[in-house]
């Protein structure tokens, strides 16, 4: 995936980009095994040896049928219809395969259908992968060329548009302004429909899974021996959702940069703009160099090496998170303007100064946000963001004033971001509302609690998934300004608190790559914490998640809690939360010069 740091709006393309990542993950031959529930965690399974082979004659309307009974679907539906299957012969770039499209009708006559697709390779290894979506979904993820990876590996693949249709992709990233308030050609009305919202949150995954299982059995004569969910961003949230809600359906989960606290993540850019209603609180892009320089000055050295990389993310977070520690401290004191008044708003240098109001805004962005009342699963805060090298990324900082803010006239635009429907539609139930009218703990509080139950994948109790033998690998980046690394870290901790470290280590890996963004890529910063100019390099980030998860699930080969990742000529330990790579001695570009250390 392209680096969001270079262009925050690139996240609009997430479905296609996420699929590219998925192709990379799944284009590997793997072993197969048993279909039933794994008797106990760690049980080795005997592999199946022969693929099931089909031809076009095996995938016909007569054999497949035109519908699926509603009783076969584990969430309420109005019906399931199937389109005539299509056969594609092998080409130099693809194996032969069949495509089955279908539509799952809503129970609510005003609702939207779930469009889904199942792709069935001619030679099937008894594996299946449900592919996660991206952004706010609205398109079937398998409509863009991913078959070269999954089908070549003899996996059946399937996915859906999650129950609403968008003519163009619309995600929930945080551009600072502009763009259609709905962000898609399918209309905004779906955001006012309860069934459509709940489909997006969780039901579409189960409905699509159950339909795909019926189709797979009708075509091959049996269901998959191993079923995986692989997703990035929204798809990563979906992957964790199915582990939390439908654990019996999946053997392995790969979740990349999951948007766990989805309901608040959509609201977060509005919370920042609300904080910036007074002109004196408005942080502009001119301050970016000073902000990232201050992060580096205080946090670069915390990993034992000043090289333009903040590896010790937990200690760095603790410096700037005002929700913990001394509430009277000021981590931004070094940048405070004389008398707390910014007299040079156009200063773009690393020496730019901040007003007291701007400092309060930065404290808010880099501290846990406390809710008026707990949301789903008892979550009391939203983790917000960590010290990073991309403080303007994804609209965290904008150079525009919006209706409802001081200095914005009556004709000023209302603030818009790609997930605005999650605020005006899901929450405010008025797509024409001004999102800056939101008040924490106000009249919308009960609605906040309700949609949180539908959308947030924050249940720390993964015991059902663990007991059925499921395995998961979750990877996040601390420079991610599209997701919230703070909320991801807080979720990791909640799972450890609930289940215990020893148990978690038997079935899950929570990997953290310091200083990479939403695409799990990033670079070192050219000015180290001591102010010296240093060469920049790509942050090591490359490792094969799918090979790891299949080996763990199917051969009981657990990945290490510390791996080695590479990029270019550099390598670095990849550590499990909360550990980080601490420099010991030796060449800084070699992983052997570091150790996995607790914060």
Predicted regions and their residues:
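Alpha/beta-hydrolase fold nucleophile elbow
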Residues: 222-232
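Gly/Ala-rich beta-loop-alpha elbow adjacent to hydrolase catalytic centers
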Residues: 231-235, 239
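A catalytic-pocket lid/entrance helix-loop region that shapes and gates access to the active site
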Residues: 241-243, 248-370, 526-543
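Gram-negative bacterial Sec-dependent N-terminal signal peptides
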Residues: 7-32
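Short beta-strand/loop motif that positions the catalytic acidic residue
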Residues: 474-476
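Cap/lid segment of the alpha/beta-hydrolase catalytic domain
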Residues: 135-221, 267, 432-454, 516-536
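Short beta-strand element of the alpha/beta-hydrolase
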Residues: 126-135
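Catalytic-loop region of hydrolases
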Residues: 35-127, 140-145, 181, 309-310, ...
């Amino acid at each position: 995936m392209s680096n969001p740091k270079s262009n925050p709006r690139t996240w609009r393309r997430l479905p296609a980009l996420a699929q590219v990542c998925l192709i990379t993950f799944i284009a590997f031959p793997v072993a197969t095994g048993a279909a039933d529930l794994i008797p106990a965690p760690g049980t080795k399974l005997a592999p199946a040896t022969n693929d099931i082979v089909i031809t076009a004659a095996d995938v016909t309307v007569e054999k497949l049928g035109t519908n699926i009974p509603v009783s076969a679907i584990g969430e309420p539906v109005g019906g399931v219809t199937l389109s005539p299957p299509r056969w594609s012969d092998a080409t130099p770039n693809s194996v032969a395969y069949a495509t089955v499209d279908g539509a799952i009708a809503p129970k609510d006559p005003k609702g939207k259908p779930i469009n889904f697709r199942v792709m069935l390779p001619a030679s099937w290894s008894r594996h299946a992968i449900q592919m996660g979506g991206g952004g706010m979904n609205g398109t079937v993820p398998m409509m863009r060329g991913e078959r070269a990876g999954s089908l070549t590996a003899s996996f059946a693949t399937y996915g859906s548009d999650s129950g609403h249709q968008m003519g163009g992709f619309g995600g929930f990233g945080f551009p600072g302004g502009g763009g259609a308030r709905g962000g898609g050609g399918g209309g905004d009305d779906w955001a006012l429909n309860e069934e459509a919202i709940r489909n997006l949150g969780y039901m579409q995954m189960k409905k699509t899974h159950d339909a795909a299982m019926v189709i797979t059995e009708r075509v091959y004569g049996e269901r998959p021996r191993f079923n995986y969910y692989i997703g990035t961003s929204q798809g990563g949230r979906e992957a964790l959702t199915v582990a939390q809600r439908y654990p019996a359906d999946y053997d392995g989960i790969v979740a990349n940069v999951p948007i766990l606290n989805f309901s608040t993540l959509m609201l977060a850019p509005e919370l920042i703009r609300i904080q910036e209603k007074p002109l004196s609180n408005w942080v502009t892009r001119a301050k970016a160099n000073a902000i990232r320089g201050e992060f580096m000055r205080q946090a670069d050295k915390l990993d034992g090496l000043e090289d333009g990389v903040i590896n010790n993310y937990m200690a760095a977070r603790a410096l700037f998170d005002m929700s913990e520690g001394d509430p009277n401290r000021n981590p931004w004191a070094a940048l405070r303007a004389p008398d707390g008044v910014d007299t040079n708003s156009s200063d773009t240098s690393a020496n730019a100064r901040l007003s007291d109001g701007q400092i309060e805004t930065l404290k808010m962005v880099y501290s846990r946000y406390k809710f008026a009342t707990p949301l789903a699963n008892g979550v009391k805060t939203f983790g917000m963001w960590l010290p990073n090298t991309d403080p303007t990324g994804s609209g965290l900082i904008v150079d525009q004033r919006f209706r409802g803010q001081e200095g914005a006239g009556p004709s000023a635009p209302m603030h818009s971001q790609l997930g605005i429907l999650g605020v005006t539609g899901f929450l405010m139930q008025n797509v024409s509302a001004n999102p800056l009218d939101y008040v924490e703990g106000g009249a919308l509080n009960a609605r906040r609690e309700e949609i949180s139950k539908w959308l947030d994948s924050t249940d720390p109790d993964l015991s059902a998934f663990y007991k059925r033998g499921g395995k998961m690998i979750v990877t996040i980046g601390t420079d991610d300004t599209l997701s919230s690394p703070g909320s991801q870290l807080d979720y990791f901790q909640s799972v450890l608190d609930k289940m215990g470290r020893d148990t978690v280590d038997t079935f899950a890996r929570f990997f953290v790559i310091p200083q990479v963004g939403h695409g799990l890529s990033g670079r070192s910063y050219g000015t180290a914490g001591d102010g010296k100019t240093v060469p920049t390099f790509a942050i090591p980030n490359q490792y094969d998640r799918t090979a790891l998860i299949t080996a763990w699930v199917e051969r009981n080969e657990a990945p290490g809690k510390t791996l080695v990742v590479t990029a270019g000529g550099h390598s670095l330990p990849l550590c499990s939360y909360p550990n980080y790579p601490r420099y010991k001695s030796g060449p800084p570009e070699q992983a052997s010069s570091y150790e996995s250390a607790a914060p």
